[in-house]
């Protein structure tokens, strides 16, 4: 495992859960890309509410299945690795969504405990 402690870059991608690429959720395609490019790791977060360029508020209600909720995909890695993957991310994103970077100070990067599997 390579260490990425210290000053790194946070890549944050915000998009609608309804976005697709080749009939698959776009966030899934982005996750597959980041894994294939061997970035340190990625996390996908689903928002409970948000609004975008259309100014309409999208929210999750138990009584109604909502579409277009915000998805946030976050990756922390070196500047070089983030810079290398950005053109590919941009190509997948097409129109819509937000892609941003910011500096991040990584205090700890360690593998999770082994998962407990049921027998």
Per-range role (PLM):
Residues 1-119:
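Positively charged, small/polar-rich N-terminal and surface patches that mediate targeting and assembly
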């Amino acid at each position: 495992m390579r260490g990425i402690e210290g000053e790194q870059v946070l890549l944050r991608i915000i998009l609608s859960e309804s976005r697709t690429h080749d009939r698959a959720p776009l966030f899934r395609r982005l996750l597959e890309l980041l894994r294939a490019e061997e970035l340190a790791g990625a996390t996908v977060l689903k928002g409970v509410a948000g609004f975008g360029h259309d100014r309409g508020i999208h929210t999750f209600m138990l009584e109604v299945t909502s579409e277009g909720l915000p998805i946030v995909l976050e990756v922390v890695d070196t500047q070089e690795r983030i810079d290398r993957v950005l053109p590919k991310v941009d190509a997948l994103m097409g129109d819509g969504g937000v892609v941003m970077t910011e500096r991040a100070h990584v205090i700890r990067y360690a593998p999770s405990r082994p998962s407990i599997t049921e027998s």
